[in-house]
Amino acid sequence: PEYTFYHQCTDFFQALRYVQDYGNLYYGKTDEIYGVGDSGGAMLLTYCAAMQNNTEMAAAAQVSVCPAPLQALGLISGMFYTNRFDQIGLSLPKYLYGTDYKQSDFAPYVNPTYQKLVQALPPCLLVTSKNDNLHHYTTKFEKALTKYNMPHRLLDFPKNKQLTHAFSVFEPFLPESTQTIQAIAEYFAEIHEQ
């Protein structure tokens, strides 16, 4: 592949550097940066946040991180698992990580529940619903956060045919979407107060 997951991480950190360098011009507080992502963006955000606190992981990805720390994450319907024996994992890994990723230094990090990755994360608010086709990804990832005593919260909506994958992004005017955005904002405010 011409453009891999590692390139996406590099782009993310270039954007974060821009925010760090120029955010003050727009009255932003560059020491109070929070991140929200959905689906594949939630996965990218998770990995980039972990790389900020795990130099071994960043080196394995050959990524130069931006030191502006992400204070907390909002992860909506995260596509955390990319190498499972399912629709995502059957074809995606070689395109994301390269054809030889299993022999690379990054190989252990492909598992998002790898202890060194999980313990490098800032506080996380996870959002899913019973009708999210990746519901099991979020709940399994939440178990890893619990196992390693990482600060987090799970917002898991009940069965409702309107609350499909990343519903708060695709259907922003649903009451549950408003509730999701409000919950993320309140969680970030709590983290800021600590």
Predicted regions and their residues:
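Alpha/beta-hydrolase superfamily serine-hydrolase fold, recognizing
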Residues: P1-Q194
